[in-house]
Amino acid sequence: MLRNQSVGNGVSKQASAKAATFSTINSTLAADDMFKRNFVSYLPLNNEDNDILFPSIKTIKFIEMLHGKKEFFKGQSIHSVLRDSAVFKKQMFYTLSHTLLNSISIQQINAEWQRHLKAFPFRSKGMSFQEYFNIWYYAIKQVILEGILQTINYILQNLDNDIYNKYIDWICTIGITPIVTLPKNKVTLTPLAKSISSRLIQEIIRNKQNFLLHILTQISSTSIADFTNINIYRNKSDGNITCLSNNKELEYFVYSAPYFINNQLLFTTPLAHLYSELNKHENLHRHRKMCQLLNTFPIKVLTTSKNSVDNKKILELIEREEKTSDAKKSLIKFLLNLSDSKSKIGITDSIEGFLQDITPSIIDQNKLLISKGNLQRRGQDNNDRDIRDIFKKQIIKCMEEQIQSQLDEIETLKTANRLFENKIKDMHSLINLSETSKHDFTLDSDIESLSLAKALNKVQSLPFTSVSIDDTRAVANSFFSQYIPDIEYADKKIDQLWETEYTRTFRLRKNVNNQGQEDSISYSNYTLELLLIPFMKHVLKLRHFELLPEEFLFLSLKEIMLAVYSNCKIKHYLRLIYIRQINELSHLIHTQKQSDLTLTPDLGSTNPEDFQYPQDDVASKLKRIRNSRHIQYIKRPEYL
């Protein structure tokens, strides 16, 4: 018993070991196969052999500017017009409705008519054949429109509207669109066929099954990569472009190829054309914000000395400092007194005071300044010459001492100045170095998004230099008020640049009202050709489709369906069946008047204006759109 259990346990262990071994081998083989298929993506990117297209500082800036990371302009909204996913949805709706409605054959219409005749035979009592046929005509029309609409909705519910938005973003920034191919799940039309009761619609779906499955497969398995984890580079030797996403190579579509001139990369997209002007405007905005923060600080005061220094003040300071005077101070006092003297008497008083300060013991005041009565006697006095000699000697002595002391002091100050100038230069260099290292270089990028308090703190820490003004100089100009540069003209210029670049690059149409004012901006027939045809052919890989007419952009989906129905061949088939039945059943309606045999306008005419409601409403709307937009379908120029 125990032996059998041990044997059983050994077998189970061997089986589990084999399973683990097989699992390891399969994982290794799968990894090896994946490595072989994606070998190129594992190789390191050599910048010397490749030119980086994306991501780079410049191309990332393209995307930030496109979606207004820092600022958004009025003219920039034209990009939203271009990336309208409703245009792509209407294009797909028009393609499907046009293909399905025109796939109906006259045999199918006749078979429906025969079934109707068999189920509800015509009887001439109380009803004309024309009324009988009209009832079936509008009934079969309603069946066809509802069945086709249900089929189209089943297809379009798998449509990712964001795929067209990403496509527009790529061609406006880089010019290259990376295409992601998703795993192709099995698609089927069986649920759709089961939900439709009309035999005619089921036949249409069955006849166009390959076409519908191809569209359903492509729109469910095709996507456009976003701007994350994408690397796009160009080989310098052969010029081949490679797109990688998470180490996996992607398909791509080149809408606008970049140029390489003098080893420089030149993009040819709208954002590349606007890049330099947008950079200038961004710098202007940053400068404006700095001025706003610096010149609107709560308190900003310019101070100066309130003391007025004149000759009288100097004399008071000298006398207060030291009452005992020496020769230098007496000489300065004498010179200041002379400068204030405006008459002979003032000069005489200045000389008298100077002599009293210098030689009070040897000067006789009566002899120095005598009255006019004693003038004759003073001229004869021998002591006058002695006084003049003493005065002259004292003046010369004071001036020599002053000049010598000034020269000595000047030399000393020059030496000290040279020493301090060197020290100041060294200190300035150290301060500038430390201030530069402390400066937050991220301030330029986030100054617009910071709160006022944080922005003020950051701006005040910038390495600005204060300037001291000497007493002998005056301020010529300064901003002591709120100085903020005006950017109104620059904003208008950028708005016009956005609109002009997009309008002329993609041939957008500006719609105006009766007063000539701009009403809206929309796709033109040129824009549809420039954007939708490459997208349908190269991205979705749909080769057979009908391009959406420009006037259909202003219709709803139901109106598009009615407009397509009014121009398809079903109407002609119905008219043919009506005339044929009139001839076959002429013996039944021989009692009717000849006017009853006349075709009604909605059956006998092929003009859109002849439709009854709601067809006539759609036709008149299309006519009004063509006239108001001046839409003309002419041959597209070769350069486009």
Swiss-Prot record:
- Cite the entry's keywords alphabetically: Host nucleus, Viral genome packaging, Viral release from host cell, Virion
- Which N-terminal residues, if any, form the signal peptide? none
Where in the cell?
A: Virion; Host nucleus
What role does this protein play? Forms a portal in the viral capsid through which viral DNA is translocated during DNA packaging. Assembles as a dodecamer at a single fivefold axe of the T=16 icosahedric capsid. Binds to the molecular motor that translocates the viral DNA, termed terminase.
Full protein name: Portal protein
Choose any GO biological process term that the UniProt entry carries and state it: chromosome organization
InterPro entries in the cross-refs:
Herpes_Portal (IPR002660)
- At the top level of its lineage, which domain of life is listed? Viruses
Q: Which GO terms describe its cellular component?
A: host cell nucleus; virion component
* Family indicated by similarity: Belongs to the herpesviridae portal protein family.
Q: Principal localization? A: virion
Subunit arrangement? Homododecamerizes. Interacts with terminase subunits TRM1 and TRM3.
The record ties this protein, via Pfam families, to: Herpes_UL6
